C-alpha cells in the first residue's frame, strides 16, 4: 500500500534507518524545466519513492526539480529509469553520488515550492538558461594557478567556514537570495575578468552564473557538478584535489571530508575544529562548530546559558 505523506514519527524512522543493514547511496540531482502540474508530479514521486524505500528531500516547482535522496543501492538504475519516464527532459540527467555513504536521511519529504532555489529574482525577462561555461577538474586546477582568475564561493558563510578553494571569495550571507542581491555591486570591479563560481552540487551556480551574465559579466564559468562533481572527476582522472577542508551537506551527515586540512575553529575555545553540531537545547538549536572537549564541557550546547536551560528541561 502506498501513501502520499509520512505516517511515522521521525524518532521511529530514525530507529528504523539505523537498524537497516542494506547498503545505500546518497544522491543529488536537479533540473530546470517547465512542470505544469506540480501536484501530480509531487504525488507520483512520493508514491514511487515510498514503494522503494527511498528517503530524502525533494522540491518541486514550475521551474523544475531539486532532490537530495538516500536510496537502497540496488535501486540506482530504477531511479534513472523512473525519472526518464517521469519526463523526457530528465533523460541524461546528471546525478551526483555523495563522497561517502553514511546514513543521510530517514524521512521522505516531497514538497511543492514556488522555486526550487529561493533566489529573490523578480525580473520577468531574466533567462535562467543563459548559464556560465561548465568546467571540470583539470581546467579548475589550471585556473586556480592563475591569480588573474577570480573564484567565488556561492554557498552560505557556514558552508564556506569548514571548506573552500584557497583564495576563493566569500559572499558573506546566510541565504542565496541575499548573495545574489549583494554580488553584483560587490564584484562590479571585475566585469571584464574571468570569474569561476562554485557551490555544493551545481544548482545554485546555474542561477548565479545566469544572473551574473544578465548583469553584464561576460567571462563566467562554473564547476560542473559543483564541489562533489569536481572531487569525483579529479579522483577519476588521478588529479590533485585542491579543495581544502570539508564539504558541508544539507542532511544528517552535516559534512563530507575532502582533505585532511582543518581550516575552521571551535566557537567556544577557538581551537581548530570542523565539526558542526546543533545546540542540544531545543529552543535554541543553533548550528555551530564545536570541538570534542567543548562538547563534553558544554554538554553539546552552544553556551552556558543554553546548557543550564537544557539541564533544567530534563529535570
Regions found by a protein language model. Give the residues of each.
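Short, well-ordered loop/turn elements at secondary-structure boundaries
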Residues: 145-148, 191-192
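Internal catalytic-core helix/loop-beta-alpha segment
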Residues: 131-146
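Substrate-contacting helices/loops that form the catalytic groove of nucleic-acid
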Residues: 200
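Short hydrophobic beta-strand that contains or immediately precedes a catalytic carboxylate
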Residues: 148-155
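Rhodanese-like catalytic fold shared by cysteine-dependent sulfurtransferases
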Residues: 2-133, 156-194, 203-315
Amino acid at each position: 500500500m502506498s501513501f502520499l505523506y509520512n505516517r511515522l514519527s521521525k524518532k521511529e524512522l530514525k530507529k528504523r534507518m539505523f537498524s537497516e543493514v542494506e547498503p545505500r547511496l546518497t544522491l543529488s540531482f536537479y533540473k530546470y524545466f517547465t512542470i505544469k502540474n506540480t501536484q501530480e508530479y509531487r504525488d507520483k514521486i512520493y508514491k514511487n519513492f515510498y514503494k522503494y524505500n527511498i528517503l530524502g528531500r525533494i522540491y518541486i516547482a514550475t521551474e523544475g526539480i531539486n532532490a537530495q535522496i538516500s536510496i537502497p543501492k540496488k535501486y540506482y538504475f530504477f531511479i534513472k529509469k523512473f525519472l526518464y519516464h517521469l519526463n523526457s527532459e530528465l533523460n541524461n540527467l546528471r546525478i551526483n553520488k555523495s563522497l561517502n555513504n553514511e546514513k543521510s536521511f530517514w524521512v521522505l519529504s516531497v514538497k511543492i515550492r514556488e522555486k526550487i532555489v529561493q533566489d529573490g529574482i523578480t525580473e520577468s525577462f531574466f533567462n535562467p538558461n543563459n548559464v556560465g561555461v561548465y568546467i571540470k577538474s583539470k581546467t579548475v586546477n589550471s585556473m586556480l594557478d592563475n591569480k588573474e582568475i577570480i573564484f567565488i564561493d556561492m554557498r552560505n558563510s557556514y558552508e564556506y567556514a569548514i571548506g573552500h578553494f584557497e583564495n576563493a571569495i566569500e559572499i558573506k550571507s546566510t541565504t542565496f537570495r541575499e548573495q545574489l542581491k549583494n554580488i553584483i555591486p560587490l564584484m562590479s570591479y571585475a566585469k571584464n575578468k574571468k570569474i569561476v563560481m562554485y557551490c555544493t552540487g551545481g544548482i545554485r551556480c546555474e542561477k548565479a552564473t545566469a544572473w551574473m551574465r544578465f548583469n553584464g559579466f561576460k567571462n563566467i564559468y562554473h564547476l560542473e557538478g559543483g564541489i562533489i562533481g569536481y572531487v569525483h572527476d579529479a579522483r577519476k582522472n588521478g588529479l590533485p584535489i585542491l579543495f581544502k577542508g570539508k564539504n558541508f551537506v544539507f542532511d544528517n551527515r552535516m559534512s563530507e571530508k575532502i582533505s585532511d586540512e582543518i581550516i575552521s575553529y571551535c566557537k567556544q575555545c577557538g581551537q581548530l575544529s570542523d565539526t558542526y553540531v546543533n545546540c542540544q537545547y531545543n529552543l535554541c538549536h543553533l548550528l555551530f562548530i564545536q570541538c570534542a572537549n567543548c562538547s563534553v564541557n558544554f554538554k553539546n550546547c552552544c553556551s552556558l546559558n543554553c546548557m543550564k536551560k537544557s539541564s533544567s528541561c530534563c529535570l
